[in-house]
Every structure is written in C-alpha cells, then in structure tokens.
Amino acid sequence: MEELQGYLEKDRSRQQHFLYPLLFQEYIYALAHNHGLNGSIFYEPVEVFGYDNKSSLVLVKRLITRIYQQNFLISLVNDSNQNRFVGYNHNNFFFSHFHSQMISESFAIIVEIPFSLRLVSYFEEKEIPKYHNLRSIHSIFPFLEDKLSHLNYVSDILIPHPIHMEILVQILQCWIQDVPFLHLLRFFLHEYHNLNSLLITQKKSIYVFSKENKRLFRFLYNSYVFEWEFLLVFIRKQSSYLRLISSGTFLERIHFYEKMEHLQMEHFVVVCRNYFHRTLWFCKDSFMHYVRYQGKAILASKGTHLLMKKWKYHFFNFWQYYFHVWSQPYRIHINQLSNYSFYFLGYLSSLLLNLSAVRNQMLENSFLIDTITKKFDTIVPVIFLIGSLAKAQFCTVSGHPISKPIWADLSDSDILDRFGRICRNISHYHSGSSKKQGLYRIKYILRLSCARTLARKHKSTVRTFLRRLGSGLLEEFFTEEEQVLSLIFPKTTPFILHRSHRERIWYLDIIRINDLVNHS
C-alpha cells in the first residue's frame, strides 16, 4: 500500500496553500497584461483589444478595487453579456471585457506558479541541465524513426473532451489546497459555462470567454491530460511488474489494491475496486511507446492486435470511471504499422518495407536470402497544406493561386516580406520530408499568389508584372532559406537546390507548429 500511495503522492507534497491573496496583488495583473496580452505568440495583437500599456496601470488598480466588492464577477458577466448583444455603452463593455480578460489571465499565472516552482526544483535536485533543443517539435521524429521500426501496431487516440468543470477543479485540488482560490475558480468556470450556454442558445459566437482566455483553459486541459497520463504510467509500471510474479502473488496483489481506503482521491479508490483488477492482468507489454500531440495521442506496441484491443477498452473504462467521460469507439483506431499512414504534427508518416536479397556463401553452396527492413518515412501532406492555403485565401480548393486582397494596401516590400516569410517557415518546418516535390508545389502557389497580389495592387496583369520584376521575386523566396541550411550544414561547395530533394533535416529550434499546419 505504501508503494501505490507513495507513487500517487509523488511531487504533490509541495502544495501551495496561499494563492488566493495573489489576486489582490498589482504585479500579478501586470504580468498578465505584459505576457498574456502583449507578448505571447498565442494571443492576438494588443491593438485588437483597443488598449495599450499606458492605461493598464489605472485599469488594474480599478480592477483590484472592484474585486473587493461583493458579487463583482456576477455583474461583470452580466455587463459583458448585455453590452455584447445590445451594442451600446462602449466604455462599460470595454471595462467589463478588459476585467474578465485580466482575471482569466491572472488565474492562469497564479495556478502556474506552484507547477513552475516544482519543475525548477526538480531540475535542481536531479542536476539536469536545461536542454532547450529538446523542446523542438522536430526532436520527436528521430525518436519515432528509431522506435517505430520495431513495432507492429499503432492506436490513434482522440482524447475525449470537454470534461466536466467540477472534475477539473478536483484535479487541481490534488495539487493546490487553497480553498478560497479553488472556490473562486469554480465560480468563474460556472459563470463561463452559463455565458457559453446563453450564447449558444442565441446562436452567437462566444466572445468574452473564448478567444481571450486561451491560457487558463489550456492550463486546465493540460492538467486534465497530465492526470490521466500520470495514472497511465502507474498502470504501465504495475503491468511490467506483473510479468515477474506468479499467479498466486497476483491474486494477493488484487486483494491488496482493494484494501486501499485512505487515499486522498476517494473516486480513485472506486476505480481501484471496480475495475483496477480487471485491467492490470492484460496490460502486459514489454515494448510500448506513447506520444501525445494536439489533443491526440499515439500508442504504439510490439504486441498483438488482441493486446491493442484490450488497451482500447481499458482507456474507455478508465475515462468513464475516473473522469466520468463517455467516449465513443471511433475515438481510438487500431492499425497495423506496415499498412498504415497517419497524420502526425504536419507530416504524413508511415512505415515502409524494403525488400532486399542477400547472397550467402557456405563452402561450395551459395543461396539468396530475402530480408525485410523497416524504415520510418515522413512526407509533406500536399492535400492538407493546399486546404490550409485555401482557408487562408492564398489559393482555391483545387490549388489554383489567387490574390490576397486584404494585403493589397500594404507596401510592395511588406507584401514580399510576408509571402517570403510564410514560404520559408513552411520549408523550414517540412524540411524533414523525404520527398520535396510537394514543397515545390506549395512554393509555386505562394509565389504566384504574391505576384497576383502585387499585380492587383498596381492594377496590372500577372504576366506584365512578372516580366517587369524579372527573377527578383524568385530570389526573395529562396535567399534566406539557403542561408539557414548552410549554417546548419556548412559545405565547401555552394548550396544546390536539387541536393535538398534527397535530404531530411530536423531542426532543433521549432517550438510551435506552423499556423498553416494547424488549419489542417
């Protein structure tokens, strides 16, 4: 019993008890304003919201004063809702919108404090240096290239959501024991739920609590995913242990789990009693890998198809009993790696089988041996990228380039810079593709879309404009890309474009997915 309880309580001893007073500290809202609204890559530019740094200090002081007042959040939501639909009293709506945004950002910053401190202390205790290169998205592909070639089956998992808000608060309660702060967070989430329901019934888009509160709800979602992955690792470790014990010891271990009654999470005890003993016995897999990305997960195994089906139903039962989430079977697809291609982080990944014959010579006899080697392959999903370009209005659905009218008012240098930056970012992100023909097609679409945009601005035809521009437009799209590649792979010979057709390059400076990849 000490083993399980110690595992569940691991890293949970440093709970923060006094987070609620931070809501009344001015510097918290300054951090929320600077990092959340003015400097983060996840948020819209500050000019969208209609305020700047000059007015932030006054508004923060006014916000702190109003927080002390009773029923502030109720009036805040009501004012935002009324002004959103009525359309008058712009100042009241602005203050309500700003206050709701700042409270949400401050909630996110405050709840991140104990987890950030725990992460820093973990690195200090383990004496682990901070390898920023491991944050790169591309760092996962060499891992998959090394591991997936030895596996047989892969399960595509769509993580169920949305989860009930009370479950989210209970998850945080295991880490944070500040009762007033949790009550206020619960009230804030319920007010968001009421506003969400109201806006849906009136067929309006969610404005106040959707686009601007990404940080808080991203944190809540990550805490939810971390909780079920935390218990998944525990079950995985127990299943590994079961391979080394006899059936009699295993039955005693089941009885041991059923006796646990003094854990902090009582609903987890119910899970242990009702279904834990039914899952541990079949979760025996000596070679399994798990990768999560963008609300999805991949579970690859060397086991049989029957084992993967057992893991599938294990996930269904686990989500239902522990998180009270009803998941449908279509959320998990089991496929054989040798006959399956899956879309992963902007790449179409698959496992290629290469047949080769090896001549073996033994004394006077020689014979051929057919060998099969597996190779993890990644290519550019051209259809998905064209669909993303079509959504961004760079081309039609069929891939025919069109002009970008909203950029026609910019200067020529700004238009060239924007198109060139998009083209270089796509080439940079998809540099790990084994086939570069798809990238050339995407570059052609962007290059011609840029030419059409410039021709539209100057009220000319594309042919006339390109004849006047010459090869300058082509150089604009390729110059900086060559410099980046030559820095990573210095050569004595100049960079030749067709050489990159055969090279797969993984960069260690990519920390977010390209926006066009997200559209797909």
UniProtKB/Swiss-Prot annotation:
Record's GO cellular component terms: chloroplast
Keyword set includes Phosphoprotein: no
GO MF: RNA binding
Places the protein is found: Plastid, Chloroplast
Domain of life: Eukaryota
Keywords for this protein: Chloroplast, mRNA processing, Plastid, RNA-binding, tRNA processing
A single GO BP: RNA splicing
TM annotation in the entry: none
UniProt entry tagged with the keyword RNA-binding: yes
Predominant cellular place of this UniProt entry's protein: plastid
Alphabetized HAMAP family for the sequence: MatK (MF_01390)
PANTHER family: MATURASE K
Function field: Usually encoded in the trnK tRNA gene intron. Probably assists in splicing its own and other chloroplast group II introns.
Entry similarity comment: Belongs to the intron maturase 2 family. MatK subfamily.
Protein name: Maturase K
